[in-house]
Curated annotation (Swiss-Prot):
Reactions it catalyzes: D-glyceraldehyde 3-phosphate + pyruvate + H(+) = 1-deoxy-D-xylulose 5-phosphate + CO2
Gene Ontology biological process terms in this record: 1-deoxy-D-xylulose 5-phosphate biosynthetic process; isopentenyl diphosphate biosynthetic process, methylerythritol 4-phosphate pathway; terpenoid biosynthetic process; thiamine biosynthetic process
Identification of the protein by name: 1-deoxy-D-xylulose-5-phosphate synthase
GO molecular function: 1-deoxy-D-xylulose-5-phosphate synthase activity; magnesium ion binding; thiamine pyrophosphate binding
UniProt source species: Helicobacter pylori (strain J99 / ATCC 700824) (Campylobacter pylori J99)
Subunit organization: Homodimer.
Top-level lineage group: Bacteria
Note on cofactor: Binds 1 Mg(2+) ion per subunit. Binds 1 thiamine pyrophosphate per subunit.
One Gene Ontology term, aspect cellular component: cytosol
List of residues binding Mg(2+): 142, 171
SMART domains listed in its UniProt record: Transket_pyr (SM00861)
The keyword Signal is assigned to this record: no
InterPro entries assigned to the protein according to its UniProt record, in alphabetical order: Dxylulose-5-P_synthase (IPR005477), THDP-binding (IPR029061), Transketo_C/PFOR_II (IPR009014), Transketolase-like_Pyr-bd (IPR005475), Transketolase_BS (IPR020826), Transketolase_C (IPR033248), Transketolase_CS (IPR049557)
Gene designation: dxs
Amino acid sequence: MILQNKTFDLNPNDIAGLELVCQTLRNRILEVVSANGGHLSSSLGAVELIVGMHALFDCQKNPFIFDTSHQAYAHKLLTGRFESFSTLRQFQGLSGFTKPSESAYDYFIAGHSSTSVSIGVGVAKAFRLKQTLGMPIALLGDGSISAGIFYEALNELGDRKYPMIMILNDNEMSISTPIGALSKALSQLMKGPFYQSFRSKVKKILSTLPESVNYLASRFEESFKLITPGVFFEELGINYIGPINGHDLGTIIETLKLAKELKEPVLIHAQTLKGKGYKIAEGRYEKWHGVGPFDLDTGLSKKSKSATLSPTEAYSNTLLELAKKDEKIVGVTAAMPSGTGLDKLIDAYPLRFFDVAIAEQHALTSSSAMAKEGFKPFVSIYSTFLQRAYDSIVHDACISSLPIKLAIDRAGIVGEDGETHQGLLDVSYLRSIPNMVIFAPRDNETLKNAVYFANEHDSSPCAFRYPRGSFALKEGVFEPSGFVLGRSELLKKEGEILLIGYGNGVGRAHLVQLALKEKNIECALLDLRFLKPLDHNLSAIIAPYQKLYVFSDNYKLGGVASAILEFLSEQNILKPVKSFEITDEFIMHGNTALVEKSLGLDTESLTDAILKDLGQER
């Protein structure tokens, strides 16, 4: 039954049978994620909710919309992908997120947070116009309710009364910040005269009871607080049901039946346990959110820790070192304190470093205001999430030339998370903005120098980028040097052709340089360093070389080679330039080395391409 491509085979009246299905799903998730890595604890925690959804609804008539969709593994297993699930996050295998091109049962692409309700509103509007039966059903995590788009969608949904079911999966992972902030806003309701008077009267009554039952006084206030979120949603015109036990299938089924009958917008508040069913992961929220391969029995990682610091660690260590000396340094991250390395700074200086939750636009705008007040804000953010704050960069930082510092992590190809998470766009869109300074380090040592430069640069916004995992260039190959605004660095002068690397592209170019040397072809190597402004001496630097080859981890359109070609055109210089950047397509998931090879960006393919361009055979 469960292995078939039919969701209606799940009998909502057979709770015991559904519980067995849940156990089967959990076992399969654990088996595959322990081997491949992936988003474990959120997927384990959402199993009963997803089984309940499939038991009651046909997801092709009632589109299931998974917010972020990293918790949708059970959905994949229930929709014909039980066996192929072994290829999860592997090159040319199943995506770790919902993906319509993978399955007709995946309604919408997902990967970024907080979009599900907005998508659902669009579906509901379309269904109303087409007079289509059915309603969208969105499963969203607690972290997603901190983003503005969630409230924008609720605003219209409550006003228009479109039929829609929202299931808020409250696993107390991301909810600590957003619900904490929401609770503060909602606490005004609890400070009102009704609540205060009612509480006072009940406490007075309870105080007359024997001490053995006086514990009810404290339980009363806790229970009354549960009403508050409901009041908030009801005031917006959204029916609220909950909180319910998100692991009790009987309760889930009955609640979904009720929500289905209402034919109005409904939010079901379900409380779940992240990592449910795997004792080692239960309650250890952040550690088991996203994992690499691990031993099922011990929970220990199968990968040994690298002796070399990751770029993220090199960045955060350097920023911490500077923050100890400079009280003007502050920092912001948008719900990624651990991923960006800002967690250690938040722990050390909680009044100066902030996790603002999933609110990238707010992160950039508030940082711009801090810069105006004389502080030095470092915004630590993944490349893929920075694009969510583009207007804030333009409107709030760059127009006024406020010196925020964008530390762009996960730049380039990121591997198993795929097209929704690749860090390939930042170069193209940032270089189009006036007043923005853009530069990139080539290794951990120059990354430290990049942080130093950003800290001292006070005349405009600046941005520097670095990759996930490690740089392509090994430590110590070239002596590190400090950054000087608009200056490149010629690492090797000899040769008839010039390899130009930007950021992590320097390491890629260096590997090609070594491969070509084995073919008796000497190549010069330039670390471009600054993309904006370009080195004003670039025309003199490139003059001795017959051809230029450009290496960088970003899209070719509007990328590094484009900037160089624009410069050459303005200088009336004719020089052959070939770009080894990313072509105009969304890049799929998989092991980074395999993905790069498929794109012709591995050392062997790049070497062959240059040999061919030079008219030589390998």
